[in-house]
Design a protein with these regions (language model features):
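Flexible, acidic loop-helix segments that line cofactor/substrate-binding pockets
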Residues: 1-29, 46-52, 68-73, 134-135, ...
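Short secondary-structure junctions
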Residues: 5, 38-47, 166
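Acidic, low-complexity intrinsically disordered regions
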Residues: 10, 43, 156-158
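Conserved, function-defining micro-sites of small-solute handling proteins
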Residues: 14-16, 39-41, 45, 92
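Conserved C-terminal structural/oligomerization subdomain of aldehyde/semialdehyde dehydrogenase
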Residues: 31, 36-37, 51-170
Length: 170
């Protein structure tokens, strides 16, 4: 399949531009660093101006920036593992924890893993970019500043005060 890149106001467009030149350079640097250190670009990596096709990297290791920092672009790395325990260890070996995904046919095992993954959001058999406006959004560790969205924002931005009035009895 193909994901249309362009103007997000058009219905056939799935990918818009990277938000700024600074962020575009960060995404490019992460991809280039991984390639220069031996990672393989399985798909994507092409650019049209400030737009990057979704990029999947394999052969990524801890020496690569894309493994140790948040990229905030359409880039992901696939890490093969031999067991759920190894997957959990790899997932939690980071100072960041915004979002994670578990892909498996064993939903019971996925739910157990999801409880142990150090991330603010864990998606099972779904991409990490999914969010819902009625659910608090945020990460753990060095990802984010707590939670935002719905009642969380109201509580954060409000100082509650309770005022009562006793009316005089006539």
């Amino acid at each position: 399949g193909s994901l249309g890149m362009g103007d997000l106001r058009e219905s056939n467009t799935w990918l818009g531009p990277i938000i700024s030149d600074r962020q575009r350079n960060r995404v490019r640097t992460h991809i280039d660093d991984a390639k220069n250190k031996g990672a393989t670009v399985e798909i994507g990596g092409q650019w049209q101006g400030n737009r990057c096709m979704p990029t999947i990297l394999t052969g990524v290791d801890e020496s690569m920036t894309v493994c140790r920092q948040e990229t905030f672009g359409p880039v992901t790395s696939v890490y093969p593992v031999d067991s759920p325990e190894e997957a959990l260890e790899k997932a939690n070996d980071s100072e960041f924890g915004l979002s994670a995904a578990v892909f498996t046919q064993d939903i019971d095992k996925a739910l157990i893993l999801a409880q142990s993954i150090k991330a603010g959001m864990v998606h099972i058999n779904a991409p990490t970019i999914a969010d819902e406006p009625h659910v608090p959004f945020g990460g753990v560790g060095n990802s984010g500043f707590g939670r935002e969205g719905t009642d969380i924002d109201i509580d954060t931005l409000t100082e509650w005060k309770w005022i009562t009035v006793q009316l005089p009895v006539n």
